[in-house]
Regions:
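N-terminal module detector in large eukaryotic regulators
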Residues: 1-351
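Extended amphipathic alpha-helical coiled-coil/heptad-repeat regions
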Residues: 320-391
Length: 391
């Protein structure tokens, strides 16, 4: 696989510009390098004493929407001085189309995280670069990396919960570590690989990462050894503290404990099945953490497992709420609700009515229009399911 590459630096008063490129570099590629203008923030000391000259940050990033082609970029950004002695960022980047990147992440994340970055430059004197021939580093085995970072089943479940929380919530997970920034590059991509193997395949492309505290990435690093930060992370995961446990609501926690402890093939199939269920309801980009957990419980029900009353009600309630998303497949949502109500109605008719209507009444109190609509919907579905059984 070949990737275009370029180097960018501030060489004169005109500001940052591409100073070396491969022949196939496009104007869109060049514009997308602007993403790294602000990475220098993480290469200043936290106490404001100055820049960390010669230190580098490794980023796995998706360019922002700017009206042109979006790229996936692997970039090394290094703090240097320009011709006027000002602190400036030298960036060497590899480019891949967003669609190709998403396909690689969906089928095998090691095809991305395993790309060798050992020869990425921190300075460049020439102006011409050949296309980058990708060479995989190897060594990306989940069991090996979990042992390396102490990711027991309980710790791995907590990591996955935090990563899903960041990706679904549009925020960032900060990995807390005692390591200095000079030693976090391998760590962040290896932990990101562990996270990717527990992610829904269609969401993996959003698993960007940075070896510094750049909260634009889904996973970033907050080093206790120094280095500035960009923004406030949504959540944190302390790599040096093995005592924390997943103490979330059982409805959600059960999913991540399953993903952490399942055999590789079982985990892979569960993720594919969950993704299929979600895709029938809403586009993946609208999938909240709650809906992802709902897909897991629906998958279990499809195997013939009878859920507890509270789990059943939660799934019904979430499907009702899902129907309010503008892009939801309302017909599929209603069919699933009817299927669930018919499936359980014979055993728990009063319980279902009490729990489901009570949930909708609470919604009505919080949001009059939407809540009444939900309440009407669940009552119609219950009436339909009962009349269908009498036929």
């Amino acid at each position: 696989m070949k990737m275009e590459q370029a180097c960018r630096f501030r060489t004169d008063e005109a500001g940052y510009m591409v100073c070396a490129r491969s022949q196939g570099l496009t104007a869109d590629n060049e514009n997308n390098l602007g993403y790294f203008n602000s990475t220098m923030t993480s290469l200043f000391e936290k106490d404001g004493s100055g820049p960390r000259m010669g230190q580098s940050i490794l980023s796995y990033a998706v360019s922002e929407e700017n009206g042109g082609r979006r790229d996936f970029l692997i970039a090394k950004s290094t703090m240097r001085s320009d011709i006027k002695g000002r602190a400036s960022i030298f960036t060497h980047a590899y480019f891949m189309g967003l669609d190709e990147y998403a396909r690689c992440m969906e089928t095998d994340p090691s095809a991305i995280y395993g790309i060798d970055t050992g020869d990425m430059m921190t300075a460049q004197s020439g102006s011409q670069l050949p296309p980058k021939e990708t060479v995989l580093r190897g060594g990306f085995e989940l069991s090996v990396l979990r042992e390396k970072y102490g990711l027991t089943d309980e710790r791995y479940a907590l990591l996955l919960y935090n990563v899903y929380q960041a990706v679904a919530g549009g925020g960032s997970l900060a990995l807390l570590t005692q390591l200095p920034l000079s030693q976090t590059q391998d760590m962040v991509r290896e932990v990101a690989y562990c996270a990717a193997m527990g992610m829904l395949p269609g969401l993996r492309w959003r698993l960007t990462c940075s070896s510094a505290a750049d909260t634009r990435a889904a996973i970033c690093v907050s080093s206790k050894a120094g280095g500035g930060g960009m923004g406030i992370p949504l959540c944190t995961f302390d790599l040096d503290d093995g005592g924390r446990r997943l103490e979330e609501d059982p409805f959600v926690a059960e999913l991540f404990r399953y993903l952490a402890s399942a055999a590789p093939e079982e985990r892979r199939q569960m993720l594919l099945d969950m993704q299929y269920i979600l895709g029938e309801l809403v586009p993946l980009e609208y999938a909240s953490l709650e809906m992802i957990a709902t897909a897991y419980h629906m998958r279990k029900m499809n195997d013939g497992n009878r859920p507890e009353n509270d789990v059943y009600d939660r799934v019904v309630g979430n499907l009702l709420l899902c129907g309010r998303v503008p892009s939801a497949n309302q017909e599929t949502v209603n069919k699933l609700l009817i299927w669930m109500l018919k499936r359980q109605n014979a055993a728990l008719p009063k319980r279902i009515m009490e729990l489901s209507v009570d949930r909708c009444v609470k919604q009505a109190q919080a949001d009059a229009a939407g809540g009444r609509e939900l309440c009407d919907c669940v009552c119609r579905l219950l009436q339909y399911s009962r009349s269908a059984e009498q036929l």
